[in-house]
From Swiss-Prot:
Protein name: UPF0102 protein Deide_03080
Superkingdom per UniProt: Bacteria
NCBIfam families: PRK12497.1-3, YraN family protein
MF terms (GO), sorted A to Z: nucleic acid binding
Species lineage: Bacteria, Thermotogati, Deinococcota, Deinococci, Deinococcales
Similarity remark: Belongs to the UPF0102 family.
Native species: Deinococcus deserti (strain DSM 17065 / CIP 109153 / LMG 22923 / VCD115)
Amino acid sequence: MRGADAEARAAAHLQGLGRELLQRNYRMRGGEIDLVTREPCGTLVFTEVRQRRTRRHGSAAESVTSRKLALMHRAAQSYLIREHGRDDLPCRLEVVTIDGPADNGVLQVLPLNT
């Protein structure tokens, strides 16, 4: 249940920043987006949530691979086409990391340059 706890905390944090939560766990063949939100300005944000209880295997941010980024990009394009009929809407990708326990670990929002 740790993954769901981390996603719930990330969603609450993003909503606290004024974003509207549009969807959790958007799935498509070969990819998934943990959270889809919309900023007050209308930009859609596709978020991967990563949590690591310890640094034994690196930080939460270090667990995001280039393969995962490619899958996120593909899933975001799929979402745009499926939900909005086009893939040229203002949007971006980000990772929310939680290092430590899901309920009180250090949370960071990291924009991705893709």
